[in-house]
From Swiss-Prot:
Component of the spliceosomal U1 snRNP, which is essential for recognition of the pre-mRNA 5' splice-site and the subsequent assembly of the spliceosome. SNRPC/U1-C is directly involved in initial 5' splice-site recognition for both constitutive and regulated alternative splicing. The interaction with the 5' splice-site seems to precede base-pairing between the pre-mRNA and the U1 snRNA. Stimulates commitment or early (E) complex formation by stabilizing the base pairing of the 5' end of the U1 snRNA and the 5' splice-site region. This is U1 small nuclear ribonucleoprotein C. The lineage of its organism: Eukaryota, Metazoa, Chordata, Craniata, Vertebrata. A zinc finger (Matrin-type) spans 4-36. Residues 62-99 are annotated as: Disordered. The keyword Lipid biosynthesis does not apply. Keywords: Acetylation, Metal-binding, Nucleus, Phosphoprotein, Ribonucleoprotein, RNA-binding, Zinc, Zinc-finger. Component of the U1 snRNP. The U1 snRNP is composed of the U1 snRNA and the 7 core Sm proteins SNRPB, SNRPD1, SNRPD2, SNRPD3, SNRPE, SNRPF and SNRPG that assemble in a heptameric protein ring on the Sm site of the small nuclear RNA to form the core snRNP, and at least 3 U1 snRNP-specific proteins SNRNP70/U1-70K, SNRPA/U1-A and SNRPC/U1-C. SNRPC/U1-C interacts with U1 snRNA and the 5' splice-site region of the pre-mRNA. Interacts (via N-terminus) with TIA1 (via C-terminus); thereby promoting spliceosomal U1 snRNP recruitment to 5' splice sites. One of its GO terms (molecular function) is pre-mRNA 5'-splice site binding.
Length: 138
């Protein structure tokens, strides 16, 4: 009879049946081994990302600080007007008024309605019913 091998636990089960696998997979040691396996995998992925970022930085492909302020005394360039930037990328909602529409006096955008709020479903209630009476034969 074929045996079932558990990669997480590095062990063979007594035999390959659904009940044996279910019992094994619901056990404390198996769950710990699965958790440890994925924890180790996540740490390896994080370390790989750190190494790639460090290598790219050392090769000069990443600037020293992406979010640095402009140098003191340097020119302050205002952000472009929203209508000058062109359409938003696909899947993004446009920000600001449509092209050709001016802002209202005071410079504030009117509040745009958001998606409708979902109300919580009412709790099911017991509906009183009359007892069913047997009908007399007609």
């Amino acid at each position: 009879m074929p045996k079932f091998y558990c990669d997480y636990c590095d062990t063979y089960l007594t035999h390959d049946s659904p009940s044996v696998r279910k019992t094994h997979c619901s056990g404390r040691k198996h769950k710990e081994n699965v958790r440890d396996y994925y924890q180790k995998w996540m740490e390896e992925q994080a370390q790989s990302l750190i190494d790639k970022t460090t290598t790219a930085f050392q090769q000069g492909r990443i600037p020293p600080n992406l979010f640095s302020a402009p140098p003191l005394g340097g020119p302050m360039i205002p952000p472009p007007h929203p209508s000058m930037m062109g359409p938003p990328p696909p899947g993004m909602m446009p920000v600001g008024p449509p092209p050709g529409m001016r802002m209202p006096m005071g410079g504030h955008m009117p509040m745009m309605p958001g998606p409708p709020m979902m109300r919580p479903l009412p709790h099911p209630m017991m509906v009183p019913t009359r007892p069913v009476m047997p009908r007399p034969d007609r």
